[in-house]
Amino acid sequence: MTIRDATLSDSAEIAALTTQLGYPTETDAITGRLAKIAGQREQLVLVAVLENTVAGWLQAHACEVIESGFRAEILGLVVGQSCRRQGVGRRLVARAEQWAIEIGAETLVVRSNTKRVESHSFYPALGFQASKTQAVYRKRLEADPNQFLRQRPIGDLGR
């Protein structure tokens, strides 16, 4: 098994895995998202490759949080159904943890949907501790997702 940075050529397999997880996604959408975050130091997108096939992917990002400091967070982790229980997820998380340490993150956070029962034993087995239960609220916005790229640099608070 090889763990490596995702590339645009992985888009179709990442889309298929994402759809398998229950989030139907088109290849073009994944390609566009990967292109937007390519080269951003605070973003990490990895794939696990088994026998020339993407068996899983992980996305993490790092940010400074006012109340809790600099942290990394796993935003998504998907392992194909046929590749589960083979160490794919464990290896992806280990690489994300290594990255988080390298960039100086104080903690690595992951959120897990309550309906993903398997993950509730997976993360504690890797040393994660449940820290809270929360409700997540979402509001769909009518916005141009490319607008962010045209905004002032992050960190410029109008000084």
Feature annotation, model-predicted:
Residues 62-65, 79-82, 115-117, 142-144:
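Short coil/turn motifs at secondary-structure junctions
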Residues 93, 100-112:
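Conserved GNAT acetyl-CoA-binding A-motif
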Residues 5-70, 75, 80, 156-157:
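Acetyl-CoA-dependent GNAT
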Residues 1-9, 143-159:
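Conserved N-terminal entry element of GNAT/NAT acetyltransferase domains
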Residues 79, 85-98, 125:
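Conserved acetyl-CoA-binding loop-helix of GNAT-fold acetyltransferases
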Residues 20, 85, 98-102, 129:
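Conserved amphipathic alpha-helical interaction elements at protein-protein interfaces in regulatory
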Residues 90, 102, 114-133, 139:
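Conserved active-site alpha-helix within GNAT-family acetyltransferase domains
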